[in-house]
Regions:
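An N-terminal hydrophobic leader/cap segment in hydrolases
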Residues: 1-60
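Short beta-strand element of the alpha/beta-hydrolase
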Residues: 65-73
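The serine-hydrolase catalytic nucleophile loop
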Residues: 76-88, 269-270
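Catalytic nucleophile-loop/oxyanion-hole region of alpha/beta-hydrolase
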Residues: 87-89, 103-141
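Alpha/beta-hydrolase-fold enzymes
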Residues: 140-231
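Active-site nucleophile elbow and catalytic-triad environment of alpha/beta-hydrolase enzymes
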Residues: 226-250
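Short beta-strand/loop motif that positions the catalytic acidic residue
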Residues: 252, 257-260, 264
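Catalytic histidine-centered segment of alpha/beta-hydrolase-like enzymes
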Residues: 287-301
Length: 316
């Protein structure tokens, strides 16, 4: 699909409006298909590498249909509105869909004692392999949003049989955190969700965690520094960021596709210019951060893009 075909409706061009409407507005204005779609979804418990993850499976009518896996963004879940929207579009188009929930996300903080962090590549690779085994497939599609897009690119490096599509992926974690911290709106949003996750973790494992000291930390940067120092084995914040920084030659020879917007308020488009030529980068003028809201029904052009992308690669 030509990336130039995205044209938001009148009044929907502002990138911050796009991003906020996609995240908040779609939780309020629910599509007519949502209740029936989620009712038919099947939960799958995934136990890999000593961890307990979950996914939601949305089966196509054809047992032999191709599989597409979806990875949500940071502090999202398999039931995030944008994930459900893409899953519904793909399932309606004839694909099996597996919506993975990363550790601790989506109300799963009580399933594992250890805390999630964004450098847990091997755990997510193992989960993808588990899902592909469930569907008895040697190849599959994978789409990830934002931090999930970063995971999708890392998985493409280790599982070359995947047809990976990363929507507005974080390339430089440090710059992404700094960009979030530069906006009061985005910083408060992520701070609230992250603190909520830690509160769930403490409630599930009170003998292991006491996050009371984090309440005095008022920025995403200081909270990240606290988390890395107190709850991971990384030597420092720079070592943590480096573990999933995708700049330089990290993705050399990896075949994957990136869809992103020049007006993304969280991930600067310039981050994609240095990616190796094996990564097919498609940049639109507008779209915000993983939003691409095309009309006032809050439908996303990303769903159209995903349908065309995976139909070309998995149905040919």
């Amino acid at each position: 699909m030509d990336q130039r075909s995205f044209q938001p409706a009148l009044g929907l061009s502002n990138p911050n409006l796009q991003t906020i409407v996609s995240s908040v507005g779609r939780k309020i204005i629910k599509p007519a298909w949502l209740q029936d779609f989620t009712r038919r979804s099947q939960r799958r418990d995934i136990r890999v590498q000593g961890q307990h993850l979950t996914a939601q499976y949305d089966y196509a009518h054809n047992d032999d249909a191709a599989l597409v896996m979806i990875i949500h963004g940071w502090l999202g879940s398999a039931d995030s509105s944008y994930v459900l929207s893409t899953a519904h579009t793909l399932q309606t188009a004839g694909f099996h869909v597996a919506r993975l929930t990363l550790r601790d996300h989506g109300g799963t903080a009580d399933l594992n004692e250890g805390l999630f962090h964004s450098a847990m590549t091997e755990e997510v690779v193992a989960a993808a392999e588990f899902i592909m085994n469930d569907f008895d497939c040697n190849t599959a599609g994978l789409v990830g949003f934002s931090m999930g897009g970063n995971f999708a690119l890392r998985l493409a490096a280790q599982l070359p049989q995947l047809h990976a599509l990363a929507i507005c992926p974080a390339i430089s974690p440090q710059h992404t955190v700094e960009q979030i911290g530069s906006s009061i709106i985005y910083e408060r949003y992520f701070l609230g969700k992250w603190r909520g996750l830690w509160q769930q973790k403490q409630a599930a494992f009170p003998h292991l965690y006491d996050f009371s000291s984090m309440n005095r930390l008022g920025s995403i940067q200081t909270l990240t520094e606290f988390f890395i120092k107190e709850h991971t084995d990384f030597e420092n914040l720079q070592a943590y960021y480096a573990a999933y920084d995708l700049r330089g030659d990290t993705l050399q020879g990896v075949n994957a596709t990136v869809l992103a917007a020049f007006d993304d308020p969280i991930i600067p488009a310039e981050h994609y210019r240095s990616l190796p030529t094996s990564i097919d980068v498609n940049l639109t003028q507008r779209g915000g951060h993983t939003a691409y809201i095309k009309n006032w029904r809050l439908e996303s052009w990303v769903d159209d893009y995903c349908r065309a992308f995976f139909s070309e690669r998995l149905k040919s």
